[in-house]
Amino acid sequence: MPPKTRGAVRKPRKKDKKNIALGQAHIKSTFNNTIVSITDPNGAVISWASAGEVGFKGSRKSTPFAAQMAAEAAAKRAQEHGLKKVDVFVKGPGSGRETAIRSLQAAGLEVGSIQDVTPAAHNGCRPPKRRRV
């Protein structure tokens, strides 16, 4: 009796190299984490990184240094696809906002414009209680 196989054997899909010169960097900086997504002009994600994905855990994810490392990792992966210039969109109140932008520039990406797209409620849901630090 032949040995049973568990479904089809899947080959790892090779990432195809897109050639994109201009893109957008979306930086979402919360009190707990920083997520950097780099997209093409249509919004399709080329690369992303977060403070947790880069190796930081717990309260260290919310530091500016973690945001810097996440932005560098996302920028390196995006440059492999030929990205040279980005427009930056920053969202959220976190501590890693400026650091992430600076590290995108330091990684070799040319920053065209910086926009703050933090959503502001027009008296919608009740916000969480005030932080006591």
UniProtKB/Swiss-Prot annotation:
Keywords: Ribonucleoprotein, Ribosomal protein, RNA-binding, rRNA-binding
Chain residue ranges for the region called Disordered: 1-23
GO molecular function: rRNA binding; structural constituent of ribosome
InterPro entries membership: Ribosomal_uS11, Ribosomal_uS11_bac-type, Ribosomal_uS11_CS, Ribosomal_uS11_sf
Signal peptide: none
Keyword RNA-binding found: yes
Subunit record text: Part of the 30S ribosomal subunit. Interacts with proteins S7 and S18. Binds to IF-3.
Protein family membership: Belongs to the universal ribosomal protein uS11 family.
Name of the protein in its database record: Small ribosomal subunit protein uS11
Originating organism: Arthrobacter sp. (strain FB24)
